[in-house]
Amino acid sequence: MKKSFIHQQEEISFVKNTFTQYLIAKLDVVEVQGPILSRVGDGMQDNLSGVENPVSVHVLNIPNATFEVVHSLAKWKRHTLARFGFNEGEGLVVNMKALRPDEDSLDQTHSVYVDQWDWEKVIPDGQRNLAYLKETVETIYKVIRLTELAVEARYDIEAVLPKKITFIHTEELVARYPDLTPKERENAITKEFGAVFLIGIGGVLPDGKPHDGRAPDYDDWTSESENGYHGLNGDILVWNEQLGTAFELSSMGIRVDEEALKRQVDITGDQERLQFDWHKSLLNGLFPLTIGGGIGQSRMAMFLLRKKHIGEVQTSVWPQEVRDTYDNIL
């Protein structure tokens, strides 16, 4: 039992360390330290889809402030790039840990505990467009494939990912599968191609509903991308044979500029956010144009090690029935 546990831990560490090294080298980012707490009222917290409640923390020796455990570091990273004067094409990555207690369900792929490579880069002049988004996606996908090949060489786990990732807009997906739900569309397209980047998540589609929810103040999901489609963000999905479903490894996108921010808070009815310090800084042109996202560490390990439950690669909290069902929950 001890031997199996140690081997399990070594596999997880190998995936995380290998991916980190490749990501830093290929994406050309530096690894930095990030916070676990965000001060309430400065606008730095990531509100995700807008309905999740963060964990509140009161610090004894800072009585006049309330803090929250971060959901992600989407806004903090952009603030940090500006604060320390990162140049065009430069960026950072954080070994981010967070809590999301309002997950809809605790299942094979969702946990209260979130660990991800949270990264952000300053966009080179004139490249705030879909082409640059795709180029960055291809770089990250290359890192995923290189890590998979390293796992194959070390642990004899067969590599399954295609050499290329397929790009498709959510608006195209609705037209292609008009009678399917968003999740069913993801399953259909990802099973066909093996690896997909789904472009444009957050805006209302021709069927009157968004593919999925996104907060209005980090990704740009309203700007036109190409051919009348909208959204400069998306998700990297791979086909997970163990689960028989599409499997999200990363959510990322070009971040809002001043116009996209104002447009999107009008759509979502979150105009009050513009009074926060972070949002004022953006509107006053104090932040660089950036691209960024999060890549799930436990999800990456789960996929590359062919595990059936995320609890096999991270230590979290689970209902007893989950522990009774899966022998290798940590």
From Swiss-Prot:
Keywords: Amino-acid biosynthesis, Asparagine biosynthesis, ATP-binding, Cytoplasm, Ligase, Nucleotide-binding. The keyword Oxidoreductase does not apply. The gene is asnA. One of its GO terms (biological process) is L-asparagine biosynthetic process. Belongs to the class-II aminoacyl-tRNA synthetase family. AsnA subfamily. It is found in: Cytoplasm. Pathway: Amino-acid biosynthesis; L-asparagine biosynthesis; L-asparagine from L-aspartate (ammonia route): step 1/1. It is an enzyme of class 6 (ligase). It comes from Streptococcus equi subsp. zooepidemicus (strain MGCS10565). PANTHER family: ASPARTATE--AMMONIA LIGASE. This is Aspartate--ammonia ligase.
